[in-house]
């Protein structure tokens, strides 16, 4: 379990956060119109950079979803009173009074541990959305630069 937590910590540490992604894009979005050829050459490098970030956040989003499902199952057992003393101690929880089956959803929706797990999932999904938008812009940049080069040739009489 300790190794799992260490790997998880390292994975989170090396992953870019949303603010970093936006800062990267602020810098990478600038184009030097005086040298469109160089800008065309940069597109695959930028694509690789953002594809790597996208992949990390997609995996993290899925992992957060699975963590949520596992946590939800544990909390259902906890709130329904089906956990034994060993399981309670393993999680550091106090015994919970039995709750009616119809009330369990209310407890699950208000559970801070589960909410944190959902927040993490939503955060990674937002990062995925931002990076997908950046990737679409990079696709468009390719065509924009080619059109710009063609226009410059036309104006120059070539």
Label the model's feature ranges.
Residues 2-14:
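Short, Lys/Arg-enriched N-terminal segments with co-localized hydrophobic residues
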Residues 11-158:
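Charge-rich amphipathic alpha-helical interaction elements
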């Amino acid at each position: 379990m300790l190794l799992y937590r260490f790997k998880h910590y390292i994975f989170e540490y090396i992953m870019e956060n949303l603010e970093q992604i936006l800062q990267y894009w602020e810098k990478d979005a600038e184009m030097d119109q005086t040298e469109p050829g160089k800008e065309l050459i940069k597109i695959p490098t930028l694509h690789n950079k953002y594809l790597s970030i996208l992949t990390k956040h997609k995996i993290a989003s899925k992992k957060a979803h699975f963590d949520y499902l596992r946590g939800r199952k544990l909390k259902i057992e906890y709130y329904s009173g089906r956990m034994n003393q060993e399981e309670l101690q393993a999680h550091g929880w106090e015994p919970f009074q039995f709750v009616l089956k119809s009330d369990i959803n209310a407890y699950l929706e208000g559970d801070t541990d589960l909410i944190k797990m959902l927040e993490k999932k939503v955060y990674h999904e937002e990062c995925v959305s931002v990076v997908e938008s950046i990737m679409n812009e990079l696709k468009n940049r390719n065509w924009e630069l080619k059109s710009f080069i063609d226009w410059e040739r036309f104006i120059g009489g070539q």
